[in-house]
Amino acid sequence: MKIKIKSLFLTTVMLLMGIHFQSDVYAHADHDKDANVITMADIVIGIQHYATAKDQKHLQAIIDSDSSTADEKIIATAIINIQHQATAGDKQKLQEIIDNTTPTSTVSALATIVHGFSHGISSADKRKLQTIKFKG
């Protein structure tokens, strides 16, 4: 009887440990899903007036990638086109993203920041972008 209880106890502990560690795997399973958003957030943090040539190469890679979403391509294009602020045409497309996505989404947050970009970003926007990079 003692062996059955001990065996049942060990099995239960192992099962609970497996469930616990599996949830950690699932929590980070889609980490790369937001890789483009994280890259763009990192670029926008460093922009002063316009994106550097190096940043533009990274953004162009996002635009050219088949795995990038339409929203990611629009945001990347808007960042490339920034000359002190987003262009009027890009602002219109960014506003469509903002209006059609969940306000708490990283895509919506990034679109909002790029839409409001003017010679740089505010401290509050920088914190939002750093949060996007951290949570990725």
Predicted regions span which residues?
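Bacterial N-terminal signal peptides that target proteins for export
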Residues: 1-10
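C-terminal segment of classical bacterial N-terminal signal peptides
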Residues: 16-24
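Immediate post-signal-peptide N-terminus of mature secreted/exported proteins
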Residues: 25-65
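Fold-core signature of tandem repeat domains
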Residues: 44, 59-63, 76-82, 94-98, ...
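Short, solvent-exposed mixed-charge patches
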Residues: 134-136
